[in-house]
Curated annotation (Swiss-Prot):
Official protein name in the record: Cytoplasmic tRNA 2-thiolation protein 2
Subunit comment: Interacts with ctu1.
Superkingdom assignment: Eukaryota
Function as written in the Swiss-Prot or TrEMBL entry: Plays a central role in 2-thiolation of mcm(5)S(2)U at tRNA wobble positions of tRNA(Lys), tRNA(Glu) and tRNA(Gln). May act by forming a heterodimer with ctu1 that ligates sulfur from thiocarboxylated urm1 onto the uridine of tRNAs at wobble position. Prior mcm(5) tRNA modification by the elongator complex is required for 2-thiolation. May also be involved in protein urmylation.
């Protein structure tokens, strides 16, 4: 639903309630109240779709992955509405919420914005900031052939040894998600809620295919999924809403978010694919929803294989796939020796300039 603000001089009426229309959507013109209600109904409808999967048809404790951007802050608003924190909620979906923000580097401006917004609008929701130093002290080592060394506790995480910017950023995204699942287990959360909009999910479909991780698309784009050998549900209730709609929604409601997160996208596969879909919203407004609906038709394959590096489900025998898709076939001696490394990570490891030390998530004790 691509939208634009109507000129104040326009004399059009809302198609729903006959009040003055303020937002022009793909199909009609609506007022602020009806636009907000439409967005919230879309998100709540997705939440209701996953309710039957939860024990007792609700989550005892849900962890909200908050980056501070538009989508995650909009997700926080809706999750709080559906929680037990509202006294008038007769059918809550969440008994408890825990908002978590991972802070990379020393800049705490985003964390401060999130904390102020939560204190003002959601005072009952606990909020935790996990710093980089707290997470990345213990590592395991891997070389370009996927060999793992588990006794590397004295080394720091060193993504700079990956020469490719795209591979480096990809690794950071995968480690972040791995940390989220690990922390959810330790915090006794049975659910993780992500604020991925439809625009983000459509971009992620292309991103995963380009990285050679197409096998993992159902886990990364479904409204509700569970990783193999993991009891935590992964929810993405904003998958039917465009990022442009969420920006209008947040502005109308006067809710804070960090706009800098949108402007400062790195020049990586993720940034390129998301910019691609955002730029096509005006010309092809149905493109994002088409890609999202297509991804929802992909069924979760039956597998127990997990990549030791990115922790995503993987198709086994990554070395065979690498040999088939490489123009100049490398010698078997130089190939990936660890069969527990997925195809996407095996490609990234090829660009290593030295030994890579990856956070040993299970040892961190976060």
């Amino acid at each position: 639903m691509q939208n634009t603000a109507l000129d104040n001089s326009a004399d059009s009426k809302c198609s729903k309630c006959d009040n003055k229309a303020t937002v022009l959507t793909k199909s009609d013109a609506v007022c602020d109240s009806c636009f907000v209600r439409r967005i919230e109904n879309k998100i709540r409808r997705q939440f209701e779709l996953v309710r039957p999967n939860l024990q007792g048809r609700k989550s005892k404790r849900a962890m909200l992955a908050i980056s501070g951007g538009i989508s995650s802050m909009a997700m926080l608003e809706t999750a709080n509405y559906l929680s037990k924190y509202r006294d008038d909620n007769y059918r809550p979906m969440f008994d408890e919420l825990l908002a978590v923000h991972f802070q990379w580097g020393t800049d705490s401006a985003v964390a401060k914005t999130i904390e102020e917004s939560i204190s003002k609008n959601y005072p009952k929701c606990p909020f935790k900031v996990i710093g980089e130093a707290e997470l990345l002290n213990r590592t395991i080592a891997t070389d370009s052939r996927g060999n793992i060394e588990i006794n590397a506790d004295n080394e720091k995480f060193n993504p700079e040894v990956i020469s490719s910017l795209a591979s480096r950023q990809d690794l950071l995204y995968r480690i972040r998600d791995k940390l989220l699942v690990s922390y959810a287990r330790k915090a006794n959360c049975d659910t993780i809620v992500f604020g991925d909009s439809g625009t983000t999910i459509a971009a992620r479909v292309l991103e995963l295919v380009a990285e050679g991780r197409g096998f993992a698309i159902p886990w990364y784009t479904s409204v509700c999924s569970k990783l193999p050998n993991c009891d935590t549900f992964l929810l993405r209730p904003l998958r039917e809403v465009l990022s442009s709609d969420l920006k209008s929604y947040m502005n109308i409601k006067g809710l804070a978010f960090c706009d800098s997160l949108i402007e400062a996208r790195p020049n990586t596969i993720h940034g390129v694919t998301e910019s691609y879909f955002s730029s096509l919203n005006d010309t092809f407004p149905s493109l994002v929803s088409t890609v999202v609906k297509m991804s929802s038709k992909l069924h979760v394959p039956s597998t127990e294989a997990i990549c030791t590096i990115c922790n995503l489900p993987m198709q086994e025998d990554a070395e065979t796939w690498l040999q088939k898709t490489t123009v100049e076939h490398p010698d078997s001696v130089e190939g990936i020796k660890n069969q527990n490394v997925c195809y996407g990570c095996s490609v990234s490891l090829k660009s290593l300039k030295g030994t890579l030390h990856i956070p040993d998530i299970e040892k961190e004790g976060i």
